[in-house]
């Protein structure tokens, strides 16, 4: 009788462990990819990828209503997946697109842009990752929508842009 009780307890524990494991597998995204941040932009400067000129972030926020800032790298596979969406966004006239090349070799970054196209009006080099940290990035790719008038991040997308995010961005910048 005591032996049966021990087997039953072990079986219940095993069942519980499997339940928790499989429940965890069903989580689609552990982050909040469409978080509205309302974080004020801090001014910083960095070198531009092609011209090597120092550019301050306040110079980037142009007369356009919105700026999209995308953090990417040539070695990042999800960055390749989202690039077609960035190309489409880069064709919008009312939009300023800035790329932040994260912890990458500038030669590889240029090859990436040559191969896949350049959706950005400007690409800043973030060799040590400090710009990404200032913006509040968790990793790459990440995309931020900035309201230029208020100089605030109004939307943040963690992970690659997909169909759903793309449509959300289009509706937001109308």
List where the protein language model places each region.
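Conserved segment of the thioredoxin-like fold in thiol-based oxidoreductases
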Residues: 91-92, 96-128, 140
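Short pre-active-site segment immediately N-terminal to redox-active cysteine/selenocysteine motifs
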Residues: 40, 65-67, 71-75, 139
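Hydrophobic beta-strand anchors of alpha/beta hydrolase catalytic cores
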Residues: 68-69, 97, 143
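A short beta-strand-turn-helix
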Residues: 45-67
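N-terminal targeting signals for export/organelle localization
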Residues: 1-47
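Thiol/disulfide oxidoreductase modules built on the thioredoxin-like
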Residues: 114-119, 126-173
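Conserved redox-active cysteine motifs that mediate thiol-disulfide chemistry
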Residues: 71-88
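Short, Lys/Arg-enriched, disordered terminal segments
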Residues: 1-6, 26-32, 58-59, 91-92, ...
């Amino acid at each position: 009788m005591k032996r049966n009780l021990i087997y039953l307890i072990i079986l219940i524990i095993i069942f519980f462990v499997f339940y928790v494991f499989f429940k965890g597998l069903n989580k689609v995204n552990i982050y909040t990819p469409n978080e509205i941040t309302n974080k004020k932009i801090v001014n910083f400067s960095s070198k531009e990828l092609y011209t090597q000129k120092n550019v301050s972030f306040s110079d980037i926020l142009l007369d356009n209503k919105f700026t999209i800032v995308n953090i990417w790298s040539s070695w990042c596979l999800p960055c390749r997946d989202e690039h077609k969406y960035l190309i489409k966004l880069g064709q919008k006239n009312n939009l300023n697109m800035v790329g932040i090349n994260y912890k990458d070799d500038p030669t590889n970054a240029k090859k990436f842009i040559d191969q896949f196209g350049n959706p950005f009006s400007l690409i800043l080099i973030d060799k040590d990752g400090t710009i990404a940290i200032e913006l509040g990035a968790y990793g790459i790719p990440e995309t931020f929508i900035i309201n230029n008038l208020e100089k605030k991040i109004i939307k943040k997308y963690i992970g690659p842009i997909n169909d759903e995010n793309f449509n959300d961005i289009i509706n937001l910048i109308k």
